[in-house]
């Protein structure tokens, strides 16, 4: 049996939200985010948190810490220090945060003490689960309300986690409305296996025509367009034991082909 890592998108959100989950079989990015989140939760002093190479972790924690009103500096490795962060700092600063970046663009991210406005509306210029989640986590830690306009849906793991924890969050058309003033219920989260990691093995199964099942894989519809493309190419994809646990769909996946595979054209929207 092949043991795949936990879904890193969901696990990192659990780490920031301080939700319990099985910490076995997690990748380096999740470990870095978990360690940084634990350090922040246990200390009220001015901190410097190292996120290693976790772009997701540094963006999620920036939102959560900015909302908390505490002072903190977030750093990363050489690669992470070259990734732009204005897409999260700009909306947070408009909301009332005080965040500065190196060369006004890159980490280190310095967060000063501040207080966010009680109500905030933001329209996402591009589909981005990280920007959306950063703002939702800021609303939670600041106990404020936010309305996010999302014209093109992105990964909804943060919304699902908040719903699982009894938060008052819902979608109304293209709007996500979240009342962060209400306390959430901390629960154990059963994190599914990582679909992105499974994708390589799904492809290998098809290429070798092996029918080896991959068990407990997350099949959130915002993540599985890859399966649609494979089926269009002629692969036979089957989902077994599909269920929803901790508000996330999952299933065992088998993949093979019966005759031959054909080439297809895909677009960015695919």
Question: Positions of the model-derived regions?
Answer:
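Structural preference for solvent-exposed beta-strand-turn elements
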Residues: 1-270
């Amino acid at each position: 049996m092949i043991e795949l890592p936990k879904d890193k998108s969901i696990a990192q959100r659990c780490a920031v939200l301080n939700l319990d989950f099985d910490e076995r079989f997690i990748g380096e990015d999740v470990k870095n985010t978990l360690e940084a989140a634990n350090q922040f939760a246990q200390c009220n002093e001015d901190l410097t948190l190292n996120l290693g190479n976790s772009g997701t972790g540094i963006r999620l924690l920036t939102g959560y810490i900015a909302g908390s009103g505490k002072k903190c500096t977030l750093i990363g490795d050489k690669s992470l220090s070259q990734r732009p962060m204005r897409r999260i700092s700009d909306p947070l600063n408009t909301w009332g945060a005080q965040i500065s970046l190196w060369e006004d663009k890159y980490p280190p991210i310095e967060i000063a003490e501040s207080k966010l406005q009680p109500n905030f509306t933001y329209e996402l210029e591009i589909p981005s689960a990280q920007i959306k989640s950063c703002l939702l986590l800021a609303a939670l830690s600041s106990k404020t309300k936010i309305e996010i306009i999302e014209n093109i849906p992105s990964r909804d793991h943060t919304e699902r986690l908040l719903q699982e924890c009894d938060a008052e969050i819902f979608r109304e058309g293209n709007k996500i409305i979240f009342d962060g003033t209400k306390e959430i219920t901390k629960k154990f989260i059963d994190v599914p296996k990582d679909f992105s990691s499974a994708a390589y093995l799904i492809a290998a199964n098809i290429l070798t025509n092996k029918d080896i099942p991959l068990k407990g894989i997350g099949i959130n519809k915002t993540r599985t367009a890859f399966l649609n493309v494979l089926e269009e190419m002629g692969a036979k994809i089957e989902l077994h034991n599909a269920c929803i646990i901790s508000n996330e769909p999952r299933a065992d996946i088998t993949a093979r082909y019966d005759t031959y595979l054909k080439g297809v054209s895909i677009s960015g929207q695919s």
